[in-house]
Amino acid sequence: MAETQNDPLLPGYSFNAHLVAGLTPIEANGYLDFFIDRPLGMKGYILNLTIRGEGVINNQGKQFVCRPGDILLFPPGEIHHYGRHPDASEWYHQWVYFRPRAYWQEWLTWPAIFAQTGFFRPDEAHQPHFNELFGQIINAGQGEGRYSELLAINLLEQLLLRRMEAINESLHPPMDNRVRDACQYISDHLADSNFDIASVAQHVCLSPSRLSHLFRQQLGISVLSWREDQRISQAKLLLSTTRMPIATVGRNVGFDDQLYFSRVFKKCTGASPSEFRAGCE
């Protein structure tokens, strides 16, 4: 049986978390000097900031060279094929893997270098602040305190908002109000164990098929997958900040069966609810 990979810099790491962040210091011929190759992308988003050297991003025959100050955004399902540029002696890049909050979506619509890979380069006046924010996200994300992940998520939100301040917002149409309302309805009914897409669609005056299409088009994920992410996120919050019994936590996010809740939670996070709670203490 293969051992679990606990280093997010190496292939095989599961990324079963709402936020993981770090620095990848690639030196020529070093142990990290290989190309990341994920043809199907990932379930969440990845932000990538080059701080030293040069990297190269490949996507179906096209290439992009990233240099210090460049920020790339890989959305769910986007091809990941990148590494140190062969003409550079190093490529140091910071990165943040995350599952976004629903209301972030219009902040995640970036101009693309190709396919769906987004690109942003702050001007010289703003660059130091973005570098500082990235470092703060990594420090918080790697912390072991009860609120470390929430702090990292809030810092990431600040980074996304700082970017929105720095660009012409008219280039980015807002999220469809029906999708936004659907997200709010789902969030308000996480405890409903009889949830179905038809009830959400009826609430926003769409057919289930049309809602499913719009949801995936704008959020890059299915209705049910998004709801499961929100349920697990809320369960983690309740487990880490209250002494509520695990069965009650499960019922609060729509799981009447505690054993089934525990199985789903462990599948999504890599830890059982009791293990997760113990790690927060």
UniProtKB/Swiss-Prot annotation:
Residues 198-219, 246-269 bind DNA. PROSITE patterns: HTH_ARAC_FAMILY_1 (PS00041), HTH_ARAC_FAMILY_2 (PS01124). This is Arabinose operon regulatory protein. Transmembrane segments: none annotated. Transcription factor that regulates the expression of several genes involved in the transport and metabolism of L-arabinose. Alpha-L-arabinopyanose binds at residues 8, 24, 38, 82, 93. SMART domains: HTH_ARAC. Keywords: Activator, Arabinose catabolism, Carbohydrate metabolism, Cytoplasm, DNA-binding, Repressor, Transcription, Transcription regulation. It comes from Citrobacter freundii. The gene is araC.
